[in-house]
């Protein structure tokens, strides 16, 4: 397994403390990797800053060609990436290969095209004898922090728009699941000029803080927890860096009496538990109108009970383990606290799986109330709650009564109601009669404590640029 850092076009061993990397399906240590030292963090940022002088002036065509080559290499090595993601993250191998790798490849190909479509405005004369124009230019060095749940996918979401816009990047993957990012570094080093992409390894305190606080870094992009986002915003405030934050969610799933119950059950079974629920858009907070509440709970409980947890390399496995022992304990604690309320009923699951690995049973909880922690706080595991509601006004207020604002869905056959409710929901994305579906052409990002800034789409590309005015006297 590739375990070296990429700094200024060279693969080098870390000079810091060694950290274990685990296989969550067994609990065994896969390998130990040395963190980047403070000097190596500085070297990576300075290499990116030096490379920006030339990379930032390349044509969109040149940048697009590099991104397309990287997409091709990822596709050619899809099985290798899927196996690494499966072993390090615990994902079912077939899901990583069939679902994630094609989407990752598509992100790079989309931004290769988008790079050639990004324009400033050629405006006109707003002062006699002077012509104004608007430019969209790259910022410089971007520090990107990728999370442990979709390491390679999130690395793609950050690298592709930043590079397409002409920036240089220093990427720090989560120390829990770094292997696909380190493999990507190995393959990317021969495609991009030295220093354009740098990949480090290490914990937040030892590597993340010196990276994000470095004076040469112009922007920090994070996908992670609210706590990590707060820390980075505070840490970077003295240097007034631009920040791009995607900080999790607690997606409301609003099911009206007229909804297609079979479609809801199928959708939540898939989109509430994909990646063992370790997804910021997971369909985890169901509000069911009272007319269909009992039926939905019964049918959904039966469906969730059929989900198969197992070894990631088993083709029949639908749910793998959670990412770490610490996270398993967090999920277990959240469910135990829900059970202790007395009014929340465990329909299925509600316990750790016996044996090796960090497995938690797919869980459905019914009877949750609006103020319950299981409704208000992100669990980030295979846990879905169901809360009954009376009417449209009540459920919209409840759905919006959350610190999160990333994703939501509405299930109804009434087109007018779908439009009406969608317009009032305070979430970056609202799906109607589906959930979880993302495409490269559309923006992904939240509001409230879920953060700001967009991933994917032309909006995502613009986030990695600075708007400049140039005036010419003639």
UniProtKB/Swiss-Prot annotation:
Top-level taxonomy: Bacteria, Pseudomonadati, Pseudomonadota, Gammaproteobacteria, Enterobacterales
Pathway assigned to this chain's UniProt record: Amine and polyamine degradation; putrescine degradation; 4-aminobutanoate from 4-aminobutanal: step 1/1; Amino-acid degradation
Record: residues binding NAD(+): 146-148, 172-175, 209, 225-228, 280
Name under which the protein is recorded: Gamma-aminobutyraldehyde dehydrogenase
Keyword terms, alphabetized: NAD, Oxidoreductase
Record's miscellaneous remark: 4-aminobutanal can spontaneously cyclize to 1-pyrroline, and 5-aminopentanal to 1-piperideine.
Source species of the chain: Shigella dysenteriae serotype 1 (strain Sd197)
Reaction(s) catalysed (UniProt annotation): 4-aminobutanal + NAD(+) + H2O = 4-aminobutanoate + NADH + 2 H(+); 5-aminopentanal + NAD(+) + H2O = 5-aminopentanoate + NADH + 2 H(+)
EC code: 1.2.1.19, 1.2.1.-
Pfam families: Aldedh (PF00171)
GO biological process, one term: L-lysine catabolic process
Residues of the active site: 246, 280
Binding partners and assembly: Homotetramer.
Function: Catalyzes the oxidation 4-aminobutanal (gamma-aminobutyraldehyde) to 4-aminobutanoate (gamma-aminobutyrate or GABA). This is the second step in one of two pathways for putrescine degradation, where putrescine is converted into 4-aminobutanoate via 4-aminobutanal. Also functions as a 5-aminopentanal dehydrogenase in a a L-lysine degradation pathway to succinate that proceeds via cadaverine, glutarate and L-2-hydroxyglutarate.
GO molecular function, one term: aminobutyraldehyde dehydrogenase (NAD+) activity
């Amino acid at each position: 397994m590739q375990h070296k850092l990429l700094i200024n076009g060279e693969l080098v061993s870390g000079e810091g403390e060694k950290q274990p990397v685990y296989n969550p399906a067994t609990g065994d240590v896969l390998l130990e990797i040395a963190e980047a030292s403070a000097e190596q963090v500085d070297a990576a940022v300075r290499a990116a800053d030096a490379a920006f002088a030339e990379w930032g002036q390349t044509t969109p065509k040149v940048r697009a060609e590099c991104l397309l080559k990287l997409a091709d290499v990822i596709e050619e090595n899809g099985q290798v990436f899927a196996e690494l993601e499966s072993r390090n993250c615990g994902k079912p191998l077939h899901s990583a290969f069939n679902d994630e790798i094609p989407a990752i490849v598509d992100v790079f190909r989309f931004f290769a095209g988008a790079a050639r479509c990004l324009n400033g405005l050629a405006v006109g004369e707003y002062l006699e004898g002077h012509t104004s124009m608007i430019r969209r230019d790259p910022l410089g060095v971007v520090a990107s922090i990728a999370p442990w749940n979709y390491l390679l996918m999130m690395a793609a979401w950050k690298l592709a728009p930043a590079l397409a816009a002409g920036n240089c990047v220093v990427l720090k993957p989560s120390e829990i699941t770094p292997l696909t990012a380190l493999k990507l570094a190995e393959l990317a080093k021969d495609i991009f000029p030295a220093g354009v992409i740098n990949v480090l390894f290490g914990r937040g305190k030892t590597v993340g803080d010196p990276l994000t606080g470095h004076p040469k870094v112009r922007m920090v992009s994070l996908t992670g927890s609210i706590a990590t986002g707060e820390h980075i915003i505070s840490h970077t405030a003295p240097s007034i860096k631009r920040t791009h934050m995607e900080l999790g969610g607690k997606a409301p799933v609003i099911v009206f009496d007229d909804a297609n119950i079979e479609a809801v059950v199928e959708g939540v079974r898939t989109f509430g538990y994909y990646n063992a629920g370790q997804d910021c858009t997971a369909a985890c907070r169901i509000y069911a109108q009272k007319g269909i509440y009992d039926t939905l709970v019964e049918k959904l409980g039966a469906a969730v009970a059929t989900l198969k947890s197992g070894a990631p390399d088993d083709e029949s496995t639908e749910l793998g383990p959670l990412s770490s022992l610490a996270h398993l304990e967090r999920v277990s604690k959240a469910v135990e606290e829900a059970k202790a309320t007395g009014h929340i009923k465990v329909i299925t699951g509600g316990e750790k799986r016996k044996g090796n690995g960090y497995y938690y049973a797919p869980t459905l909880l019914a009877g949750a109330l609006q103020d319950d922690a299981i409704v208000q706080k992100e669990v980030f595991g295979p846990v879905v709650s169901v809360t009954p509601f009376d009417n449209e006004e009540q459920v919209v207020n409840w759905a919006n009564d959350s610190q999160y604002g990333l994703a939501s869905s509405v299930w109804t056959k009434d087109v007018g109601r779908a439009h009406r409710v969608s317009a009032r929901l305070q979430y970056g994305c609202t799906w109607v009669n589906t959930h979880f579906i993302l495409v490269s052409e559309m923006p992904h990002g939240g509001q409230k404590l879920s953060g700001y800034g967009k991933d994917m789409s032309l909006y995502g590309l613009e986030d990695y640029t600075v708007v400049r005015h140039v005036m010419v006297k003639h």
